[in-house]
């Protein structure tokens, strides 16, 4: 049981560090009102988690990569906070684009990942 917690925790730490690195890189390259870093992270995360869920990985790898790494990598809470910030700035065009693109492309990415993982 302790091993499972360690697998999830170590995976989450690695995923969070990768998310942070990508976020810093994207924000330094592209200055935009659209939250590009979080969008990229969540779409690639949807694809990768879809792939992992449908692949034949054993339970240890599912815990480490699926629950841990992907849980640390993707960021639902940042997505919601950035959405509220766009609302408060009354930047509704970007807000609704962000919401729509994230949900639509997230579903498409998860579907494609699941199809490739089979």
UniProtKB/Swiss-Prot annotation:
Where does the signal sequence lie? none
Which UniProt keywords are present, listed alphabetically? Cell membrane, Ion channel, Ion transport, Membrane, Metal-binding, Sodium, Transmembrane, Transmembrane helix, Transport
Q: Where are the transmembrane segments?
A: 5-25, 47-67, 98-118
What catalytic activity is recorded? fluoride(in) = fluoride(out)
Q: Which InterPro entries match?
A: FluC
One biological-process term from Gene Ontology? Answer: fluoride transmembrane transport
Binding site residues for Na(+): 71, 74
**One Pfam assignment:** CRCB
UniProt activity-regulation remark: Na(+) is not transported, but it plays an essential structural role and its presence is essential for fluoride channel function.
What is the recorded membrane topology of this protein? Multi-pass membrane protein
Q: Where does it live in the cell?
A: Cell membrane
CC per GO annotation: plasma membrane
One GO MF term on file is: metal ion binding
Function of the protein: Fluoride-specific ion channel. Important for reducing fluoride concentration in the cell, thus reducing its toxicity.
UniProt record similarity statement? Belongs to the fluoride channel Fluc/FEX (TC 1.A.43) family.
Q: What is this protein called?
A: Fluoride-specific ion channel FluC 1
What organism does the UniProt record list as the source?
Listeria monocytogenes serovar 1/2a (strain ATCC BAA-679 / EGD-e)
Lineage of source species: Bacteria, Bacillati, Bacillota, Bacilli, Bacillales
